[in-house]
Amino acid sequence: MPDRRTILVPVFLLAQAALVHWAAGRERVPAPPALRSFPSELGEWRQLTEDPIAADVAGELRADQVLSRTYLNTSLDTSTLHSTMLHSTTRPAVGLFVAWFQSQRAGASQPHSPKVCLPASGWIPAATGEIALDTSAGAITVNRYIVVNHEQRDVVLYWYQGPRRVTAGEWAAKFWLVADALRYKRTDIALVRVVAQSGEGGDQAATAAATGFARSLYPLLRENLPRENLPREELAR
């Protein structure tokens, strides 16, 4: 016989979809953010490349806006900004990927968890957990996910960023999707992912690079993504 979790998970997902569809019948759909004009410099980080995603990936993702770039920490290496840095084991570079979804009501696409899409692409999970980040816009909790593919090992930070809060857990994101659809008629969300390759410095150095970039990224991203028109103190970070 199937275990209780096997039965409850599909039931929950069906109930969630029904509630979101019902609640979003008069959905407040925000205007898309201008992600293409997102700053090329974030503190000590400078954009190195624009990294368009493949057409088949875009078709599967079905996001309304996508930002995919590589940034270099110029305070760590100011010698030159050429592509060979991307393949150096000591490169102070991170990959940024933001997928923004205007609506998650029935029939619309939803964010794909990196814990699903990365293993499906051949990456093997090595460690997972959550870490807290202090930023100039407040403290947030994000996922730290370490994956391996042949000789490459990456530290991945990711989170779900909505108009009212940042959420790390997938199930928490689903809960707040329903709650915010019921209360505020909003279902827009962004999946934010920061990737740093583990090189000679190992996971510790890669985590330091990823968290350093995320601290610079979050305040600017918070101001660029659609938010509720409420006093700042009423908005959950």
Regions found by a protein language model. Give the residues of each.
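Alpha-helical transmembrane signal-anchor/signal-peptide segments
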Residues: G25-L42
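Cytosolic-side transmembrane helix boundary signature
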Residues: M1-P2
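A cross-kingdom signal targeting lumenal/periplasmic-facing segments of multi-pass membrane
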Residues: L67, Y71-D77, H87-N229, E233-E234
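Short extracytoplasmic
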Residues: S40-N73
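Hydrophobic membrane-insertion alpha-helices, especially the h-region
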Residues: R5-H21
